[in-house]
Design a protein with these regions (language model features):
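Boundary at the C-terminal end of the N-terminal hydrophobic targeting segment
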Residues: 2-7
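Catalytic glycan-binding domains that act on GlcNAc-containing polysaccharides
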Residues: 8-199
């Protein structure tokens, strides 16, 4: 079996030799997922998932401040809370880290938005590989993947079989649908990526 880490290299978010802009730093009260559109496209394409899916998940996860200092305070107040611009929990991150041989640690998610986006794209790739092609028609594949990102793979598979999502999952799904057009606009504004028109 091939080493999964060899197939999905980490995008070089701070490389300037190819004309790409650096990943913008996080500022207190100034987080906008659209600022990371270039990083989203690179990470999603490296992982083989839809940039629109990744960007919409980032918009859904933008409900709390993501400045590294604020994340440290949040972690002190609520141990076990998720980290990074994509709000990844430690257990999920450790699964992704082991599978892809990532050298960074979970705490690095809070200080490195590009790494957090890369880890989120890899997790969405894993969810996509485990989601059957046939599933209930009332939920799109991207909606099921977003629910899997939020509620876990086991719940995603249950929703795919037709189990109705509970109140928290329904709330996440409503926000995901509402953020879809904003995510598409962010991607289109960053260079007109083809997935932006498919939402």
């Amino acid at each position: 079996m091939a080493d999964p880490s060899a197939a999905v290299p980490r995008p070089q978010s701070d490389a300037l030799d190819d004309g790409e802009a650096r990943t913008p730093p996080l500022r207190p009260g100034g987080y906008d997922p659209a600022q990371y559109a270039g990083c989203v496209v690179r990470s999603a394409e490296a992982a083989g998932v839809s940039p629109l899916l990744v960007m919409t998940v980032l918009h859904n996860e933008a409900y709390k401040p993501h400045h590294p200092l604020l994340e440290r305070l949040w972690q002190w107040w609520k141990p076990g809370a998720s980290f990074g611009v994509a709000n990844m929990h430690r257990v999920t991150f450790e699964q992704v880290r082991r599978r892809y041989g990532l050298s960074q640690r979970w705490h690095d998610l809070r200080d490195d938005p590009a790494f957090a986006i890369h880890a989120a794209a890899l997790h969405l790739k894993d969810l996509d590989q485990n989601l059957p092609e046939r599933h209930v028609r009332r939920l799109s594949r991207d909606e099921l993947l977003a629910l899997g990102y939020n509620a876990g793979e086991r719940n995603m598979l249950a929703f795919a079989r037709g189990v109705p999502p509970g109140p928290m999952a329904r709330s996440y799904l409503r926000r995901f649908r509402a953020h879809r057009s904003r995510a598409a606009t962010a991607l289109a504004s960053s260079g007109g990526h083809r997935d932006a028109a498919e939402g």
